[in-house]
């Protein structure tokens, strides 16, 4: 660059910093821009791997959507629990007025420190979210759900009034305001969303999410979560087999999938995932119904093997660390495994 251009650029940069503040424009090579994206675990090892970075990115917008009873709120509560373990403050904006506090506590959420709001209108919910983000005092804000963010005009109107595009405009305006503050304060904002059917679609999927297209554009990560089957103990259904697909990912390669079990009253079965991923990466051996690690039997059947790992958390961490090492994620702290524990049999 010649001297005249360099002087003109330096003057422009100086004027920008004077008008908009220091740091409003930076040179990438100066090292002032953070390259490494901070993440928080989802509570599911398989999903952390599928996301590519080991969890959901902080300072970004995330959308989690799926059919009813697919595990959307369960997944977000697990993320809140993981953030609280790191010492972060979490806020839950319950627009559906349906949060089960007892269930959240079972999933490991510290209810005493959880900030909760049950707003009357969509505008109120999004304004509260914006104020929390701008404060810089919270690490994660969850909005449950976009479909329940009812505009004030709709609440004050009559029961059959046609108000097309009102919610979409509300979401578009809110996200325009939120995104810069989310990045500046490094806050993770999760929107839970529901699925609707488009009428008259002949080709392609008729499914769509509520709240217009703005969230699809602003979200750095979009997760599609589905229930694929039931987990039974005898005739009793004790959980759901779940598939979670990374539909959009701006921070790592997208379109990866994770399969995990959600046990009722417990949440995502981490031990079940460790067994499945251990077998997949040839760390755990499977012979018939038996599972073995380093030649030692863990248990017969997945349920018994899961119970064995639950009783031996240090061994579970050791297997998890080997899986993490193979996929390039950071290891967990390993403790010495207790000796002389027999494998679990039926």
UniProtKB/Swiss-Prot annotation:
UniProt xrefs under Pfam families: RecA, RecA_C
Q: Which PROSITE patterns does the UniProt entry name for this protein? A: RECA_1, RECA_2, RECA_3
Q: Gene3D superfamilies annotated for this entry?
A: P-loop containing nucleotide triphosphate hydrolases
Chain sites annotated for binding ATP = 66-73
Q: Does the keyword Cell membrane apply?
A: no
User: InterPro entries in the record, alphabetically?
Assistant: AAA+_ATPase, DNA_recomb/repair_RecA, DNA_recomb/repair_RecA_CS, P-loop_NTPase, RecA-like_C, RecA-like_N, RecA_ATP-bd, RecA_C_sf
Q: Keyword check for NADP, yes or no.
A: no
A GO term, aspect molecular function: damaged DNA binding
Please provide, in alphabetical order, the Gene Ontology terms of the cellular component aspect for this entry.
cytosol
Q: Where in the cell is it found?
A: Cytoplasm
Gene Ontology BP term (one): DNA recombination
SMART domains registered for this protein in UniProt: AAA (SM00382)
Q: Which domain of life is it from?
A: Bacteria
Keyword annotations for this protein, in alphabetical order, are: ATP-binding, Cytoplasm, DNA damage, DNA recombination, DNA repair, DNA-binding, Nucleotide-binding, SOS response
Please list every transmembrane segment annotated in the UniProt record, as residue ranges.
none
- Family per similarity comment: Belongs to the RecA family.
This chain's function reads: Can catalyze the hydrolysis of ATP in the presence of single-stranded DNA, the ATP-dependent uptake of single-stranded DNA by duplex DNA, and the ATP-dependent hybridization of homologous single-stranded DNAs. It interacts with LexA causing its activation and leading to its autocatalytic cleavage.
**Protein name in UniProt:** Protein RecA
What organism does the record attribute this protein to? Aromatoleum aromaticum (strain DSM 19018 / LMG 30748 / EbN1)
